C-alpha cells in the first residue's frame, strides 16, 4: 500500500478505455466510399447471407460495414455514412451503414421502426 506522501508525489494513474470503434475517431458518424459490396455468412449457430460492404473512410481507414434492412441500392463507389455498432454474428464487422443518408436509400415499404431505416412518414 502506498503512503499518503507517495500518492502526493505520484498520484494513481487512470486506466485508459479502449474504443470499440477506432475508425470513427470520436465522431458520431463518418463518410466513406464503398470499395466492395458482398454477402457473407454468420457464425454458428446462425445461418443467412448478411449484406456487408467494405468502406474507405475520409480519414484513410478501410472498414467493413453492415447494411441493415431488406434490400439496398449500394454498389462500388457509392458514398455512404457509417455509424458505430457491431454485428454480433459477423466477426470483424464493427460498423453499420446509415440508411437514407447520402447514396444509401431508405428501406422500401417500411411502415414500422422507420427512423432506423431512413424512411419518411407515408402520406395518410
Curated annotation (Swiss-Prot):
Molecular function (Gene Ontology), one example: tRNA binding
Gene Ontology BP annotations: translation
Source taxon at top rank: Bacteria
Keywords assigned: Ribonucleoprotein, Ribosomal protein, RNA-binding, rRNA-binding, tRNA-binding
UniProt-listed InterPro entries: NA-bd_OB-fold, Ribosomal_uS12, Ribosomal_uS12_bac
Ligase found in the keyword field: no
Pfam family, one: Ribosom_S12_S23
One GO cellular component term: small ribosomal subunit
Family to which the UniProt record says this protein belongs: Belongs to the universal ribosomal protein uS12 family.
Function: With S4 and S5 plays an important role in translational accuracy. Interacts with and stabilizes bases of the 16S rRNA that are involved in tRNA selection in the A site and with the mRNA backbone. Located at the interface of the 30S and 50S subunits, it traverses the body of the 30S subunit contacting proteins on the other side and probably holding the rRNA structure together. The combined cluster of proteins S8, S12 and S17 appears to hold together the shoulder and platform of the 30S subunit.
Quaternary assembly: Part of the 30S ribosomal subunit. Contacts proteins S8 and S17. May interact with IF1 in the 30S initiation complex.
Name of the protein in question: Small ribosomal subunit protein uS12
Organism of this sequence: Photorhabdus laumondii subsp. laumondii (strain DSM 15139 / CIP 105565 / TT01) (Photorhabdus luminescens subsp. laumondii)
Amino acid at each position: 500500500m502506498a503512503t499518503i506522501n507517495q500518492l502526493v508525489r505520484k498520484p494513481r494513474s487512470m486506466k485508459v478505455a479502449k474504443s470499440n470503434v477506432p475508425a470513427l475517431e470520436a465522431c458520431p458518424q463518418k463518410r466513406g466510399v464503398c470499395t466492395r459490396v458482398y454477402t457473407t455468412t454468420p457464425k454458428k449457430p446462425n445461418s443467412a447471407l448478411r449484406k456487408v460492404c467494405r468502406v474507405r473512410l475520409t480519414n484513410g481507414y478501410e472498414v467493413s460495414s453492415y447494411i441493415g434492412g431488406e434490400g439496398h441500392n449500394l454498389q462500388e463507389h457509392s458514398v455512404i455514412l457509417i455509424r458505430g455498432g457491431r454485428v454480433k454474428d459477423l466477426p470483424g464487422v464493427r460498423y453499420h451503414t446509415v440508411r437514407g443518408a447520402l447514396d444509401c436509400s431508405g428501406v422500401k415499404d417500411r411502415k414500422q421502426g422507420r427512423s432506423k431505416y431512413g424512411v419518411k412518414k407515408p402520406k395518410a
